[in-house]
Amino acid sequence: MTFSEQPAIANTPSDTDTVPGVATPLTQTVTAAADRTTQAPYLRIENVRKTFGKFVALKDIYLDVYPGEFVCLLGPSGCGKTTLLRIIAGLEQQTQGRVLQGGKDVSHLPPSMRDFGIVFQSYALFPNLSAIQNVAYGLQNQKVPKAQIETRVSELLDMVGLGGMGHKYPAQLSGGQQQRVALARALALSPGLLLLDEPLSALDAQVRIRLRAEITDLQRRLGITTVMVTHDQAEALAMADRIVVMDKGYIAQVGTPHSVYQHPTSPFVANFIGVMNFLDGVVEADDTVRCGNILLTAPHNTVPPGQAVVIALRPEDMRVIDTPSATPVPNQVKAEVLGREFLGAGYRLDLTLEGNARQPIALEISANRARAMGVESLTALTIQLPPEMIRVFPKENP
């Protein structure tokens, strides 16, 4: 899929299209904003801190989410992402700071007074109600006329791929179908904000991949501002306009999926997003790092000479050199093959570098390339660590 830098914004319908308590037509066109930075944020998290006794769960969080944007809160267990989502929803009260939605301070409003729909990991459907009744529940509480409820529920069930299944009860539906009902229910009242609390983590792999594509497509079509919590890197990379990487209660990095993956700002982010090789080294010159007995050119280095560093390089970014080049190849290194792992579409080779055998690294190659190389019997090869792909970080004290 394409990772867009711009949010999706729904065209404003005419007054005649708007019915209180019922969504605007689902076929409305969605356009991309020319530049989201020119818009006011729809959701603003301002200096939010949360403590549980002496434990600090969130440390002075600042975050803007723009209209129509899909933002993923990504991080390991205990990083604070779910606590932040609960504060946005009003299910948890922040210790300090403010939450603003649509320019309005909602920091101390109860969930019932906030404008959002939410989907939980556990679906949270009423087991004694059919799919139709679950989706209609909020509309009935808002006293929407029966005919409009029927039309709206039918539209929503069709939209999530459950047309003709509204009579079924949760126990008669698969996990993916139940989550679709939960999503339709969250959208029933046309909220300004959609919150997703690890909505796919309870599903099997194939259903999860299919449903994440459906949710992303639906969010783009409706242009609804969305915040999703996940610990799954693949979900965040595939679905988000921007990823907020969290660690130990603070925001480690915010950026597009491409920028966070290709340009991590810390070893934590580099290691948490995807697979990363790390080598210890010392900066010898502005663009040169020594790792063991290997001198590597690193043009992106900003660490002063003499400082201990960690260099990072992704397995798929390294290159195999099949034949000698007429011109010198920077960062060319001989390597011994320690092991190989078949990944389906390719192989991951475990290597040690000549001149730095104490730190094994991984190299990923396509299945076609692996067959051409005779990977099953391969014991040694020559590789390049491309200078432009190397990231250099100051070595952190243990």
Tell where the protein language model's regions lie, with residue ranges.
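Conserved coupling/switch loops of ABC nucleotide-binding domains, chiefly the family-specific signature
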Residues: 95-98, 148, 248, 280
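ABC ATPase nucleotide-binding domains
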Residues: 70, 109-268
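Non-catalytic connector elements of ABC transporters
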Residues: 2-26, 31, 276, 287-398
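The feature captures the beta-strand-to-loop junction immediately N-terminal to the Walker
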Residues: 74-76
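Conserved ABC transporter NBD signature motif
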Residues: 97-105
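Helix-to-loop junction immediately C-terminal to a conserved catalytic motif
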Residues: 89
